[in-house]
């Protein structure tokens, strides 16, 4: 059996075993050095996040509510998206329901209480998601985009809930190397 040639942005690496990886083809791209990363981190203005991300201050639920006040989803607007515009509903963290050019899709569905491989430990949600896979008014989806396999972007329970609701016809767009994870969960439209 003859293999197809790899696209230009795919690269085989490894001396003792072969691994397919993505290679950035932009001439302007360069991997930052450790000293450049440290310099960048030190240049960040601490007041931008009031210490929540780079300091020892822990954000409270009230801080989150003030920064990201919850709004009810306008399901009537979702049911009738504008033809010539992009419409998006943020569910929380990485999850967005987007509608554009006649397509309705989700990004990085995470509906679980914790961004963790287990639900008894790990970072816990401060506010519930605006909608879940079980939301009755969630429209038909054309596809789901998963950006990468961190727990706060690829949530097993949410993926399985969407697959259970929409069935094998739901298309999944995932990064290189992630298809086996989906096929291992009996999701083959990847």
Where are these regions (language model features)?
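Metallo-beta-lactamase
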Residues: 1-127, 131-137
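Short, polar loop motifs at secondary-structure junctions
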Residues: 92, 175-180
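Short glycine-/acidic-enriched loop or helix-start segments at secondary-structure transitions
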Residues: 116-117, 155-157, 183-184
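Active-site metal-binding loops of divalent metal-dependent hydrolases
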Residues: 109-111, 149, 178
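Helix-loop-beta element that forms the nucleotide-linked donor phosphate-binding surface
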Residues: 182-190
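Active-site metal-binding motif and surrounding structural segment of the metallo-beta-lactamase
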Residues: 13, 120-174
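General small-molecule cofactor/ligand-binding pocket signal
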Residues: 89, 173, 190
